[in-house]
């Protein structure tokens, strides 16, 4: 069992005061703008960011590709160009960025003995040398995008909206994203190394667990049910000192089923004595079109489920310590193909050509956007 963790909201509130001290009138005067977010699945353009701004999107969850930004073992050879663009466009419109850091470079995977060349993304760092590379990269990322970071000094005309919360990995309970198979002990080491690196630069930064999908592979091994993974993670001594937030990805055909998943997360957290930890619902969504799938609910069904979910989580925001809810996804990406996720290509609030869907109208009822 663990003791209740101290809250670290104060510094975050101060950091966001200038840009995010707008509140959502339609959701009640106490709801911060950052509560309502979206996650990206398609490349984002200026037009995407402009539309997000008018829709009053508060948080943008996006991926920082470690493999893309750190392509070789040469010290300091970071390529921040794509992340710079995304962070800058978001900041210019007052949108808070919540990054999840994922995708192991081939040279780092090789340190752990993996021969995967260009398919190493999900081979999370495990050994001392690979974890040292992980720490170095996160240190550099916070130095660039955190408070007073290099990106802000290089772009003085961009409103400073530093990244204060960092999500470490993605769906680590699934073999799709954590190879060769999910490993609680291995993830705990990744988490501890990440926490050490990030807080050494920004001691008020918040660390969010990688989002966890309820039942990878339909509950079959080597996938681990999210609540079981979380419970085993809590069994690691001192682990609650390494993170501040838990991130469900409660995908289900019906919202009632998604809610049951969130409740199971909360049960595990409370049982571990960590009921004060925040919930960041970093992915939640349904599709409006595409191939037959339980999560394809059609245009109106998608909008109805968004309304149902956002209404509930808004109501329970304080009771459940919910920091934000990010809809997956912002824009359709039919070119991605069905792949591992048959419904994802049409999960956007807007179509591929940025035409509003009914679900965007539902979203803006909560944000007072247009």
What is each model feature region?
Residues 12-23:
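Bacterial N-terminal signal peptides
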Residues 5, 65, 171, 212, ...:
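Flexible loop residues that form catalytic
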Residues 117, 123-125, 162-167, 172, ...:
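Aromatic-rich peripheral "rim/lid" segments of glycoside hydrolase catalytic domains that contact
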Residues 55-220, 238-241:
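Substrate-binding cleft and catalytic face of glycoside hydrolase catalytic domains
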Residues 46, 50, 135-164, 182-303, ...:
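Noncatalytic carbohydrate-binding groove/subsite architecture in carbohydrate-active enzymes
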Residues 1-13:
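Bacterial N-terminal signal peptides that target proteins for export
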Residues 29-59, 63-65:
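Boundary/entry segment of secreted carbohydrate-active catalytic domains
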